[in-house]
Curated annotation (Swiss-Prot):
The gene is RAD17. GO terms for molecular function: damaged DNA binding; double-stranded DNA binding; nuclease activity. Residues 367-393 are annotated as: Disordered. GO terms for cellular component: checkpoint clamp complex; nucleus. Component of the checkpoint clamp complex composed of DDC1, MEC3 and RAD17. The interaction with MEC3 is performed in a RAD17-dependent manner. The checkpoint clamp complex loads onto DNA. Interacts with the DNA polymerase zeta subunit REV7. 2 RAD17 subunits also form a heterotrimer with one MEC3 subunit. The keyword Transcription does not apply. Keywords: DNA damage, DNA repair, DNA-binding, Hydrolase, Nuclease, Nucleus, Phosphoprotein. InterPro entries: Rad17, Rad1_Rec1_Rad17. It holds the Pfam family Rad1. This is DNA damage checkpoint control protein RAD17. Component of the checkpoint clamp complex involved in the surveillance mechanism that allows the DNA repair pathways to act to restore the integrity of the DNA prior to DNA synthesis or separation of the replicated chromosomes. Associates with sites of DNA damage and modulates the MEC1 signaling pathway and the activation of RAD53 in response to DNA damage at phase G1. The complex also physically regulates DNA polymerase zeta-dependent mutagenesis by controlling the access of polymerase zeta to damaged DNA.
Amino acid sequence: MRINSELANKFSASTVHLEHITTALSCLTPFGSKDDVLIFIDADGLSFVRENNHVIKIQLLLSRELFMSYSYRNETEDHMKLCVKINHILDSVSVMNRNSDDIVECTLSYDGHGSPFVLIFEDSFISERVEYSTYLIKDFDTNGLELDRERISFEAIIKGEALHSALKDLKEIGCKECYVYAKTEANDENVFALISKSQLGFSKIKLPSNRSILEKLQVFDGDSTTVIDGFAVIGFFDFTSFDKIRKSTKIASKVLFRMDVHGVLSVNILSQTDDVIITDTTRPSNNRPGSIRQLQLPKDYPGIVIEVCMLEKESIDEAAQTEIELLMETNELGNRNSFKKSTIRKRYGTDKGNETSNDNLLQLNGKKIKLPSEEENNKNRESEDEENHCKYPTKDIPIFF
């Protein structure tokens, strides 16, 4: 018997694709499996948002096309938001999906502030209702975690499988800090690499430049429009934060990297709708018929859409930039190619037109430091020598090497 009382709620939606939802919500667990997740509900679907320490944020969208029925009726608000524990929802959906040999239909419902978030699971024999208490918190402070689309420094589209393999390799070698390196040349020799910095030193993973792996790579002059060649863009990130996208890249067909001049990296992950199911080998699975285990997703469903924004750890200095350039010019045999230091986009430089910033690395009081002339130095040294009654020897004494 189907339960129709949920149709009176402001929001209700039904689906049979529980394993797909399990796969999607699992991408949130690296950002805190037992932490709060902020859910936005509107006419287009459900968005799940998590933020960690104001340095990285994930937003995952489940489009309304995933659901057999989808209803959003709210005359006063264009969206509703609530906060729950992500592991509560994930555990309920995954357990019901694995413990039933029948097709399970899941109905989600919510009736606004103060009401519980309800999940109803139904198969041919039973119906189970689960209610989760909800509460409201302030929106996550995303100031500084928004990509400046008018000041993009580079953009790359990468095959998801290749990126996941690279991240897995970085994890296995104990990467602590990660450099993202992007450079284009006029002869279409594009270079996109992930560079590991660990106790073992530097290691680089250079992605193949063929379009089947690196579909697109463009370096901009900091304005999102002017494409330039021969310039390297280098981002520096803490690998603990950077590695949080690895689980999402496992289901990705394509991954879009965009980095702005402020050091914000945006990672857009799009999954294909035909092969996003990931089997959890740590849990026993019932032998269900293949037609039930692999239910066809709706043709108009765009797939799991994920956006991750993260802040650069710090701005790297010129010495580190040169070191990375030398590493990229060294081949697999340890031989260095004809090294030609390329121009690197300085995204944190001071204003060249500001005279108060010239030659003043410490920026003391915003004033320009005046260096003493050689003549003044000689006068000061002579006066000090006279006071100390010291005389320098003549220059006729031979110098021995």
